[in-house]
Amino acid sequence: MADEPLLSVERLSKRFPVAGRRGSFLHAVDDVSFTLAVGESLGLVGESGCGKSTLVRLLARLIDATEGRIVFEGVDLAEIPAKRFARTPQRGAIQMVFQDPTDSLNPRYTARDTIREPCLLLAGMDAKAADARVDEVAQQVGLPQALLSRFPHQLSGGQKARVGIARALAPRPKLLILDEPTAALDVSVQAVVLQLLDRLRRELGLATLFVSHDLNVVRLLTDRVAVMYLGKIVEMGPSSAVFADPAHPYTQALVSAIPGHGPRIRLDGEVQSPIDPPPLCHFRSRCPAVQGRCQREAPPVRGGGHQVACHFA
């Protein structure tokens, strides 16, 4: 059906066994659900350790899920073992732009080799078509032809970022996962790369999952935003609504750190352990509005377009 989402994540969880503690598990991603439409941009925010990176690895099929579904264009990718996913048609349809372009580029490959490889391996192009595609995406990302023969150590940070973006675009994906794509770049280059990514998303009709610590960037460049805390999505909705009127106490604290968003809310208390967490509110030890009910039961997810997991929001 035309109104079906491109991606539907349903009750996705990832638990890692804890060494030396038989029967104990670290709940990195805990019962996460969301959808992503064709051409839509979803931001993913939260403190370090909240589960963003694990969720990205699950969606990119780098690791297997413990439970749940990852339905992409009607196919449940969670049923395909991560080791086999690279040989499926969906591999080229889901691509990543990594946090550090230097670490993600093969030092023995020229820029042309790097962009050409997914054309051959993922898109099934012949050599002539692959070379033509390299030239096409190089032009799209603003990478001069003269730079295509250079190796990573001969490129600037911004140029390496463009190579990484071109590599991701080469097999004509439908979903781009942007994992802190400018975190390793100089501030002077970050804005240029972000503008490039936003323009390409709109021109090519790409769906994007944008992972970032920069809340201002997420607010400006995404249609919706999901806020994660200890493996769970605690709030999700239109970016404009979430940033203008955050409903969850954790989101309120995050947004208060943005200049011009009212007085800063500082969180006290200890972060709960993600190892074998009880079925209660994960935020209860730091929440300034905690009540007895929070200590007895997990909050349900409420709302339609703007969802929040809090008893009292």
Model feature map: region roles:
Residues D3-P5, A19, F25, M236-A313:
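Short catalytic/signature loops enriched in Gly
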